[in-house]
Amino acid sequence: MKIFCDPLGDFVDLPQKPRRVVSLASGLTEALVHMGYGEAIVGLSSWCPNFTPLQVPVVGDYLSVKEEVLREVNPDLILITTGVQRGLARKLHREGWPVYVLPLPNSLHGIFENIMLLGALMDDLEAARALIRRWQQRFAELEAQAPVPRPRVYAEIWFGKHVRMAGGLTFIHDLIEVAGGQNIFGDVRKGYLSLDLAEVMRRAPQLFLVYSEPEYPIQAIDLLHERGWEMRPIQADISPAHNIIHDGPSMMQAAQWLHEQIRQALR
């Protein structure tokens, strides 16, 4: 069947119910597994094994594919996202691969919208709705336990050597709110902001949430000492239960962990 893919500006020809899926986005991969479609996945990105135990070939990374492996697994659907993956998506589409591009989510609602799109692509909207309901219920339970008043949280995200602050147009904002905190940049109409230490201090955070990756590890406690700040540190990392930048179902675990970290920091 032909489906219009807006990020590509073109129609893509996909089967009614895909049987051989390559997913190049870890959040989408994990969502498919939780929807009951792990057996349909025949290829992954190099980042996906952090979130799923599937024993299938690694077809590529976030920005490239191994063409010989892609030909071997012969997918009838390739899942990819916008942002920096858009160029790869267009290349695969030009080469005739059955690629569908989903938007990078700016919020929790965007994540749920992508899950519904996955359900539509797999011809199983009910599986998508069931996952969303479970996710919403867990988040509602956590948010009901939020401390009063909520502590002010500053989230600093290190993408390798590149540092950003989490604004209001991110699902990290939603994660902080669900876990019981208040994002100090939640009123800013942007996603990721350039580092502005003076503005951070003006907004007077109580908790310092830092995410970094093993290739360039950054410790919250070290930054506090370096900057002379006095606030409670919370250290996030790439493990599914502590990963605040991942948009798959293990966000439920990350929200529980962050909720517990916030509670402990307030004692």
Task: Give the predicted meaning of each segment.
Residues K2-C5, R19-V73, L77-L88, I184:
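A short, structured surface patch at a secondary-structure boundary
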Residues F51-P57, V69, H109-N114, Q219-A220, ...:
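Short, charged, surface-exposed secondary-structure boundary motifs
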Residues P18, S64-G83, W97, S194-E213:
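Proline-aspartate-enriched helix->loop->beta-strand connector
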Residues L88-R94, I218-E230:
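Short, aromatic/basic amphipathic alpha-helical patches
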Residues Y37, L54-Q55, E95-W97, A179, ...:
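Short, structured coil segments at secondary-structure junctions
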Residues W47, M165-G191:
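Alpha-helical, coiled-coil/dimerization segments enriched in small aliphatic residues
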Residues M1-F4, D10-L14, R20, G87-K161, ...:
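Extracytoplasmic substrate-binding proteins
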Residues A31, V69-E72, K91, L175, ...:
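Well-formed, non-transmembrane alpha-helical positions, independent of function
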